[in-house]
Amino acid sequence: MSIITKSAGLAQKMVKALFILPFLIFFGVIIHFAVPIVKKSDPKLLPSALINRDVPYTNLPTLSNYKEGFNHADLLGRETLVNFFSSWCGPCRIEHDLLMEISRSKSIRLYGINYKDKPEAARNWLNELGDPFEKIVADKDGRTAIDWGVYGVPETYLVDKKGRVRYRHVGPLTEKVLEEKLMPLVQMLREKR
């Protein structure tokens, strides 16, 4: 094999490498920027702009006269959990037994906001599984959920006695979240009185 043949082979390999290199760099840059975006797209990781701020103005209709409704003024005076839920929401069903336990324990006031649901479907769901809510309203168009910063149901907010949002939980509530985060925060808020 002559030096010319070796040089030609080497030149072909270099041309191929130079042709492929921009594509490798391009995909490397895409991956570099896409991975953090995908990791941050988990709503549980997104902070709530409402923490330590007053609850948004809330004045919604009742769930078709199912139960007494509430507005933002009703969130004053006592710590309250506000739970956004829907009858069509699978994770809402998962957390429902825990909401029933919270309601039975009377450890904290629990209000519900039914999100983008048919009133009759929501009433049937509550009749079937039990109704943990002291008061409940219907957010038929989802506007109030947007004001609260809801990414999807279920979401639960802890509101202090002054009407400020103190904690937000995305997804179904669990015993662990209740025992390790929510109730200690409720206790701390009560001790500040």
Regions found by a protein language model. Name each.
Residues 1-61:
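N-terminal targeting signals for export/organelle localization
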Residues 40-41, 61-67, 136-139:
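Short gly/ser/thr-rich secondary-structure transition/capping motifs
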Residues 58-81:
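A short beta-strand-turn-helix
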Residues 81-82, 110:
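Hydrophobic beta-strand anchors of alpha/beta hydrolase catalytic cores
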Residues 83-88, 115:
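Aromatic-flanked redox-active Cys/Sec active sites in thiol-based oxidoreductases
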Residues 93-130, 140-146:
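Structural microenvironment flanking redox-active thiols in thiol-disulfide oxidoreductases
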Residues 127-132, 139-190:
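Thiol/disulfide oxidoreductase modules built on the thioredoxin-like
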